[in-house]
Amino acid sequence: MAKEKFSRNKPHVNIGTIGHVDHGKTTLTAAISAVLSRRGLAELKDYDNIDNAPEEKERGITIATSHIEYETDNRHYAHVDCPGHADYVKNMITGAAQMDGAILVVSAADGPMPQTREHILLSRQVGVPYIVVFMNKADMVDDAELLELVEMEIRELLSSYDFPGDDTPIISGSALKALEEAKAGQDGEWSAKIMDLMAAVDSYIPTPTRDTEKDFLMPIEDVFSISGRGTVVTGRIEKGVVKVGDTIEIVGIKDTQTTTVTGVEMFRKEMDQGEAGDNVGVLLRGTKKEEVIRGMVLAKPKSITPHTDFEAEVYILNKDEGGRHTPFFNNYRPQFYVRTTDVTGSIKLADGVEMVMPGENVRITVSLIAPVALEEGTRFAIREGGKTVGSGVVSKIIK
């Protein structure tokens, strides 16, 4: 188990890779790890190690979210490799929420594709504040004008979703070539492009001002039982600080429970405390594994309460964004993805509103079938039949 203390000499930032399936997100993640490991700034993680969820092997499609860590001269990074395939947008919704910034991977050979657009939209909706672009597979494009066109197209697409397209750093390179160089023990032109990318990430994605002053809150992503030690829940601390010995509540879905923190770990290393932005495992005293499920939150006692009914501002995707082709009516019952969980709920439209068309912004009242830890400002996605149909933010709690 974790023994070494986790060092905090460098500021910590959470980033991840997003983009269309097969544009090279996982290869880029492996290339960053390989190039930085040659400089003693990362532990080498190869492609298979990152692409490691068993169910994705036969299709070569990344489903699970992999976490790797590395450093630059300036910062320490936790990097998530987000799923790219449309069927796994659910994971993107929970995964992209873990980012202070994202590296959008776009194949220079193909240009932006439907999922490129969807991931930019999702980044906008789940609050990923900064995007840096890696134009991958540049070794396959001989025409400099074509590269320029793809770059312009990417900038326009970012701007259309309210990201500053004109100011966004776009680095072109080849993740595969960089990976091959690093494996051969060389530092060539392609590895230099990876270093350029990391320099852009270092300078363009600000070190986030952490919410350490606020009340502790951590959405639960996973629950494990460790024999002889008890139950561990993992997730990214959304705000506040948790220390060994703290009394905390487990809120949402079932009745609120109170427990005590007996350990905090990050990347298998023990810490005295975890703070906002950290991906941690929290050991809970006397809590049984079956009492805790994904979608609950750990929180400072009395700081957040479970709710079923709220008002929200939502944007309903149009069909070009992958949304519905038809309107919906009063009492529509989709799923609401809040933090790490999905709960069915019914939608009540405002008086005088007959229906909602794709592409509209509306205020709705939602009634969930199970209570979830909510507060004003909590963001969520609306999903139906395996696709995102809308996105919103809680504007007022009703009950």
From Swiss-Prot:
EC number assigned by the record:
3.6.5.3
Q: Could you say which residues bind GTP here?
A: 19-26, 81-85, 136-139
Family annotation (SUPFAM superfamilies) = EF-Tu/eEF-1alpha/eIF2-gamma C-terminal domain, P-loop containing nucleoside triphosphate hydrolases, Translation proteins
Looking up InterPro entries in the UniProt record yields:
EF-Tu_GTP-bd, EF-Tu_GTPase, EFTu-like_2, EFTU_2, G_TR_CS, P-loop_NTPase, Small_GTP-bd, T_Tr_GTP-bd_dom
The segment annotated G4 runs over 136-139
Tell me the Gene3D superfamilies matching this sequence. Answer: P-loop containing nucleotide triphosphate hydrolases (3.40.50.300), Translation factors (2.40.30.10)
Residue span of region G1: 19-26
Q: Which UniProt keywords apply?
A: Cytoplasm, Elongation factor, GTP-binding, Hydrolase, Magnesium, Metal-binding, Nucleotide-binding, Protein biosynthesis
This molecule's function is given as: GTP hydrolase that promotes the GTP-dependent binding of aminoacyl-tRNA to the A-site of ribosomes during protein biosynthesis.
Subunit info here reads: Monomer.
The family this protein is said to belong to: Belongs to the TRAFAC class translation factor GTPase superfamily. Classic translation factor GTPase family. EF-Tu/EF-1A subfamily.
Q: What is this protein called?
A: Elongation factor Tu
Source organism: Campylobacter jejuni subsp. jejuni serotype O:2 (strain ATCC 700819 / NCTC 11168)
